[in-house]
């Protein structure tokens, strides 16, 4: 009787998750099909009526779309590296239990998660530091993320202190302990937090809207919105319709992480146990 109940429960779960999966996959599949369809036709189709790559050629051969794409790639790469660097160094400092004032620093950081400066004061500070209309402004601001720093700290705290103390007795510097011991044991945290940074930078729209007024510095999300709204359509390659170009742009916007995610998935499973003992 118990086995029968378990089987029924499993079947119900499978049905529910299958429905959820279809709800998420079907819209993406529709956009993908329409991005290759050179014939202007609306509605759901299993395959393109007139297959072609003209929509993607319109994106990558037009400077008004290619430049924002490259800017997004640059800011995502630089921002992710800087964000991870800040999180790793900050987390490593906060796990040094002998350091005086460690608890005070941690509490100050946590305080900023609850009470921030607000939009207007932040804008004024950015302006005073000449970081408006500057790509470094939209790179540096999200890089300082206390939430990610705390996650990294929790993971580091799961590494046995005895390992680091043994390395210190053997004459290792803090940099060597971090590089040789802590980071190799933290691949799951680095992958998980790194992807969170990367997704945030790639999808960043708000910071560009607030701090960037020079259209030459817009990222792909800013151009994508203008394209979808129909206010900034690029000159289409012969054979590409307006609908084809719009759908191709959407696919370009989501494709990088659809490719990256399967390779990082195993680290997310490990990342569920952030803070677990690794001894």
Regions found by a protein language model. Name each.
Residues 2-279:
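A hydrophobic, multi-pass inner-membrane permease signature
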